[in-house]
């Protein structure tokens, strides 16, 4: 059966892994997923990620981050879904928790956080929000 929302699946794996206090989780690899993980790592929400080719298909091993036993990611949600795409200009990008969280945006300049997109004055598809 085909997966309709691969990015949503990865975010759910991260959420479930942190609830289960896992050190790392595996997710099938794709360029979009790797770019989103790059933003999460840059912003300090995960320790890192690496490509894991031990199985039949390429996968991404996501190293989850905890602070004093609590997950670094309190909330992660998909915003733009396959059934309803959400786009935003650079000036209308949503802020998460008054700037305490980030919005991940797919722009013509790549996948960026909301702050980076505002700085570069580009808008795009609002992929997810994290705090």
Swiss-Prot record:
Please give the positions of the paired cysteines in each disulfide bond: none
Q: Name one Pfam family in it.
A: Ribosomal_S8
Q: Tell me, what is one Gene Ontology molecular-function annotation carried by this entry?
A: structural constituent of ribosome
Q: Does the keyword Ribosomal protein apply?
A: yes
Entries under InterPro entries matching the protein: Ribosomal_uS8, Ribosomal_uS8_CS, Ribosomal_uS8_sf
Q: Which GO terms describe its biological process?
A: translation
Which domain of life, per UniProt? Answer: Bacteria
Keywords noted in UniProt: Ribonucleoprotein, Ribosomal protein, RNA-binding, rRNA-binding
Assigned GO CC terms: ribonucleoprotein complex; ribosome
Q: Relate the protein's function as given in its record.
A: One of the primary rRNA binding proteins, it binds directly to 16S rRNA central domain where it helps coordinate assembly of the platform of the 30S subunit.
Provide the family line: Belongs to the universal ribosomal protein uS8 family.
Q: How does it assemble?
A: Part of the 30S ribosomal subunit. Contacts proteins S5 and S12.
Enumerate the HAMAP family for this protein.
Answer: Ribosomal_uS8_B
Q: What is this protein called?
A: Small ribosomal subunit protein uS8
State the organism named in the record.
Answer: Erythrobacter litoralis (strain HTCC2594)
Specify the taxonomic lineage: Bacteria, Pseudomonadati, Pseudomonadota, Alphaproteobacteria, Sphingomonadales
């Amino acid at each position: 059966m085909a997966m309709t929302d691969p990015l949503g699946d990865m975010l759910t794996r991260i959420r479930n892994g942190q609830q289960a206090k896992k050190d790392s989780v595996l997710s099938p690899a794709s360029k979009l997923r790797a770019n989103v993980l790059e933003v999460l790592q840059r912003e300090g929400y995960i320790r890192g990620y690496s490509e894991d080719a031990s199985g039949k298909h390429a996968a991404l091993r996501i190293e989850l981050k905890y602070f004093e036993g609590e997950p670094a990611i309190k909330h992660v949600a998909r915003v733009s879904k396959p059934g309803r795409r959400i786009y935003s200009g650079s000036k209308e990008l949503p802020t998460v928790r008054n700037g305490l969280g980030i919005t991940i945006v797919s722009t013509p300049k790549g996948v960026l956080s909301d702050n980076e997109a505002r700085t570069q004055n580009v808008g795009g598809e609002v992929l997810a929000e994290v705090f």
